[in-house]
Curated annotation (Swiss-Prot):
Its EC number is 2.1.1.177. Belongs to the RNA methyltransferase RlmH family. It is found in: Cytoplasm. It holds the Pfam family SPOUT_MTase. Specifically methylates the pseudouridine at position 1915 (m3Psi1915) in 23S rRNA. It catalyses: pseudouridine(1915) in 23S rRNA + S-adenosyl-L-methionine = N(3)-methylpseudouridine(1915) in 23S rRNA + S-adenosyl-L-homocysteine + H(+). The lineage of its organism: Bacteria, Bacillati, Bacillota, Bacilli, Bacillales. SUPFAM superfamilies: alpha/beta knot. GO terms for molecular function: rRNA (pseudouridine-N3-)-methyltransferase activity. GO terms for cellular component: cytoplasm. S-adenosyl-L-methionine binds at L76, G108, F127, G128, R129, L130, T131, L132. Keywords: Cytoplasm, Methyltransferase, rRNA processing, S-adenosyl-L-methionine, Transferase. This is Ribosomal RNA large subunit methyltransferase H. It comes from Listeria innocua serovar 6a (strain ATCC BAA-680 / CLIP 11262). NCBIfam families: PRK00103.1-3, tRNA_RlmH_YbeA.
């Protein structure tokens, strides 16, 4: 399985870089995983609704340009469907079983994802109703993908 994680902005925090690198190393035994960063749109601290939409739309164009046409797209969205780790694992396994070898996860910037990206997605998931920094979501996502592969293969993983 080829998994692409498309994210907005550059990762700056050293502890996140190290954590993600560790899980990418572990994941290499199960799948080819790549992270693609697209530039975030510079914006003032306070934005009108129209300005927020404009920022998300510009970031959305950049995101969509990086997603392969034949990829199954999973957008991480606050209003997405919540799943347990076991459900997430089963869903990834089904994708592999039914020939979806390319999966693209999308993590938006601090304002979220554009309507165009949400429309392009095949599904939207949420890891909870908490608001987490989008950069931290990268680490959470790669950990959950790793956990999913361990669950599917019946391999032990601490709870």
């Amino acid at each position: 399985m080829n998994i692409q994680i498309v994210t907005v902005g550059k990762l700056k925090e050293k502890y996140l870089v190290q954590g993600i690198a560790e899980y990418l190393k572990r994941l290499s035994a199960y799948a080819k995983v790549s992270i693609v960063e697209v530039p975030d749109e510079k914006a003032p601290e306070v934005l009108s609704d129209a300005e927020m939409k404009q920022v998300k739309d510009k970031e959305g164009v950049r995101i969509l340009a990086k997603i392969p046409d034949d990829a199954h797209v999973i957008a991480l969205a606050i209003d997405g469907k919540m799943k347990s780790s076991e459900e997430f694992a089963a869903d990834l396994d089904k994708l592999a079983t039914y020939g979806k070898s390319k999966v693209a996860f999308v993590i938006g910037g601090s304002l979220g994802l554009s309507e165009a990206v949400l429309k392009r997605s095949n599904e939207q998931i949420s890891f909870g109703r908490l608001t987490l920094p989008h950069q931290l979501m990268r680490l959470v996502l790669v950990e959950q993908v790793y956990r999913a592969f361990r669950i599917v293969r019946g391999e032990p993983y601490h709870k």
